[in-house]
Amino acid sequence: MESTLQRPALAPANISPKATTAVYWIVTALFCLQMSFTAYAQLHLPQVAETFTHLGFPAWFRVELSCAKLLGVVLLLAPAPARLKEWAYAGFAINLASALIAHMAVGDGPEAWGWAAATGVLWALSYFFWRLK
């Protein structure tokens, strides 16, 4: 099945395909490392479990979210169809936006939601350069 994705309108015309691919893989690797680490932390670190309780989420949600993150990481790193990668990027966008909203809703400061915001920047760069490839 052929992809219907189009090159982003803001794409710089003078960036080489090799540079685009290199930047994509560097940013995507950093993003996937962050998502893998948070998936691990959600499953194994008690202080992260306490944070989920503080945010009002049930204990089972950590397991579900970690599994979804790991599946998304695999889809971004593997040679998967474009539609599946789009779904992975959409899932990560929802996850990161929800993390920001949840932390702000309970009054947490930037020390709590800053990582989600920084990871969101990595997400945006990864998605942008994926679309350029």
What is each stretch, according to the model?
Residues 2-133:
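Membrane-interface extramembranous regions
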